[in-house]
């Protein structure tokens, strides 16, 4: 999709851009694959804020996406390419030959009328899903499982992709979007191609109201709060932090402290870290 530029008729429209939605083929989603979503506004079951900066925004229906792609040997036809308000990627409605309908992530290059299939014998073609062990070295993939049969957990955002680097025993080496090289079981599935809608990251929001439409509330700096609300708060005028290091609202170190579990079992599966040259 291309980027749409607006004339600066107001300050909000100045520098504002949006997607032109040229790839979208319908505005009407498949009703059988919709689930209602309740707006939690970042609150838990006690009504307390557990995730800040959430609330408001447009009502949405959740689209049930097939992340497992486990209907082996059953061909499907792409019927529509649709917008999904719950993710950055577009989605595609596919009709299987046995009558089942499903949504999948729409990879770059997938077109209406195209036929796709899943299984170990599937061709290396955009939209097809195979076990990692059956995918040749150098192939660009997305929608990757971490546990066989659980459903894809990696490389699902718009424009994201990974690459198969090789095979070591029952594991396959995959270079992720971040540059991290990781070993993943060869029986885990992945889909061929890059996730579509890659220009989504180039959109300039332009005004605060567009973020409010998305359910994103303002982020207030700790330094302008009172000391009972934030460790950075208080003081006369623009006071410094007053601590050895910046803190979160709950007093924990912020900005740079590593939060990964040092005993994470998946450490042994990471061949190269994302920040290594």
Curated annotation (Swiss-Prot):
**Keyword rRNA-binding attached:** yes
Q: Which InterPro entries match?
A: NA-bd_OB-fold, Rib_uL2_dom2, Ribosomal_uL2, Ribosomal_uL2_bac/org-type, Ribosomal_uL2_C, Ribosomal_uL2_CS, Ribosomal_uL2_dom3, Ribosomal_uL2_RNA-bd_dom
Can you cite an annotated GO cellular component?
A: large ribosomal subunit
Q: Give the region (Disordered) as residue ranges.
A: 222-277
Quick check: keyword Aminoacyl-tRNA synthetase in the entry?
A: no
Checking SMART domains in the record gives: Ribosomal_L2, Ribosomal_L2_C
Pfam families in alphabetical order = Ribosomal_L2, Ribosomal_L2_C
GO molecular function terms attached to this record: rRNA binding; structural constituent of ribosome; transferase activity
Write out the function statement from the record: One of the primary rRNA binding proteins. Required for association of the 30S and 50S subunits to form the 70S ribosome, for tRNA binding and peptide bond formation. It has been suggested to have peptidyltransferase activity; this is somewhat controversial. Makes several contacts with the 16S rRNA in the 70S ribosome.
- Known partners and oligomeric status: Part of the 50S ribosomal subunit. Forms a bridge to the 30S subunit in the 70S ribosome.
Give the record's family classification.
Answer: Belongs to the universal ribosomal protein uL2 family.
Q: What is this protein called?
A: Large ribosomal subunit protein uL2
Q: State the organism of origin.
A: Streptococcus agalactiae serotype V (strain ATCC BAA-611 / 2603 V/R)
The gene it comes from is rplB
